[in-house]
Amino acid sequence: MKGYVESSLLYSTWSEVACIGDAVVGFLFGRIEKTWKGRSRMRTLLVELSMTARFLLRNPLMLARSFGLMWNVWITELKLAEHRPRSDAEIELLIVDSKNRGEGIGKDLVDRFITAAKEAGAEVVTLYSEDLQSNYQFYEKYGFRRVATFYDDVTSYFANKASTAIIYALDLKQSTDTERQ
């Protein structure tokens, strides 16, 4: 999980943490394209490859499985490139502690991100999720629409069972706050 969070943070230009008292109960990492200024995508990719190599070298069993993992990552990235619509912003990672779900924390985090994206001139927000652990009903209730699904090679690899990737998009020109109540 730590590596997944670090990777998501690498590609993010916006982050927010939700706390109740001293406890972190949720966070959202997102990318708003117009705020990417001065960041090198190649450098970001190299940092992510370095993180992945460190992870694989720590565990000999993972190193042996690394070729399978890399193949699955490559295939999934190709599918994402094929199916993901053009967007100005993307939710990289949204997590709310299971004990605090249903309290409006996720909605508040997404509302703040959407507001920042609109203020930056974004027109479309996308997100990539999967069917095994995602609360996809939350995204659909919020107003995101499914634009693509495909076999998720990476999640299936780690879960050791079939998983479907889901790509969502929210058109900010058509979306209003009253739709998401």
For each of these PLM feature ranges, what is it?
Residues 128, 145-162:
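Conserved catalytic-core motifs of GNAT/GCN5-like acyltransferases
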Residues 96, 102-115, 141:
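Conserved acetyl-CoA-binding loop-helix of GNAT-fold acetyltransferases
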Residues 88-89, 117-130:
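Conserved GNAT acetyl-CoA-binding A-motif
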Residues 35-88, 153-161:
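Conserved acyl-donor/pantetheine-binding loop and adjacent beta-alpha core of acyl/acetyltransferases
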Residues 1-15, 19-21, 29-32, 50, ...:
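Active-site rim helix/loop that mediates acceptor-substrate recognition in acyltransferases
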Residues 22-27, 89:
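Glycine-rich phosphate/pyrophosphate-binding loop shared by adenosine-nucleotide-utilizing enzymes
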Residues 94-96, 129:
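Hydrophobic adenine-recognition pocket in adenosine-nucleotide-binding enzymes
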Residues 13-17, 27, 93, 165-167:
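Short hydrophobic/aromatic beta-strand element in the GNAT-like acyltransferase core
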